[in-house]
Amino acid sequence: MANVDELLETFGNMTLLELSDFVKKFEEKFEVTAAAPVAVAAAGGAAAPAEAAEEQDEFDVILEGAGDKKIQVIKVVREIVSGLGLKEAKDLVEGAPKPILEKVAKDAADAAKAKLEEAGAKVSVK
């Protein structure tokens, strides 16, 4: 365990350029890569872009317009977006098209879209 602590201390004293050089040499010596596993998965999916689109797991909910029932839409926006005050929600609705939620799960995006559409808003999920 002392060796690991010594290595950490040494790495802590190195500059970013020295660390970058170390990583390159480490990758060459042990024939590995320091790339994140997500990047590896994305590289495999690049061969079939249609499949990559189907496997999307993060969605943005975009408010395209408030429609006729702006007050109802503002109430729903405040309900969906936590910590949003009345003025912020009003500005968000009046400034449409704007993202309401970003990088959320499909279930959450669909639920938010349904609530907003029920209130009279025009919404898209991307």
From Swiss-Prot:
Entry annotated with the keyword Transmembrane helix: no
GO cellular component, one term: cytosolic large ribosomal subunit
Signal peptide residue numbers: none
Keyword Repeat listed: no
GO MF, any single term: structural constituent of ribosome
Protein keywords: Ribonucleoprotein, Ribosomal protein
Taxonomy, superkingdom: Bacteria
Gene Ontology biological process terms in this record: translation
Annotated InterPro entries: Ribosomal_bL12, Ribosomal_bL12_C, Ribosomal_bL12_C/ClpS-like, Ribosomal_bL12_oligo, Ribosomal_bL12_oligo_N_sf
One Pfam family linked to the record: Ribosomal_L12_N
Function: Forms part of the ribosomal stalk which helps the ribosome interact with GTP-bound translation factors. Is thus essential for accurate translation.
Recorded family membership: Belongs to the bacterial ribosomal protein bL12 family.
HAMAP family linked: Ribosomal_bL12
Subunit structure: Homodimer. Part of the ribosomal stalk of the 50S ribosomal subunit. Forms a multimeric L10(L12)X complex, where L10 forms an elongated spine to which 2 to 4 L12 dimers bind in a sequential fashion. Binds GTP-bound translation factors.
Protein's recorded name: Large ribosomal subunit protein bL12
Organism: Nocardia farcinica (strain IFM 10152)
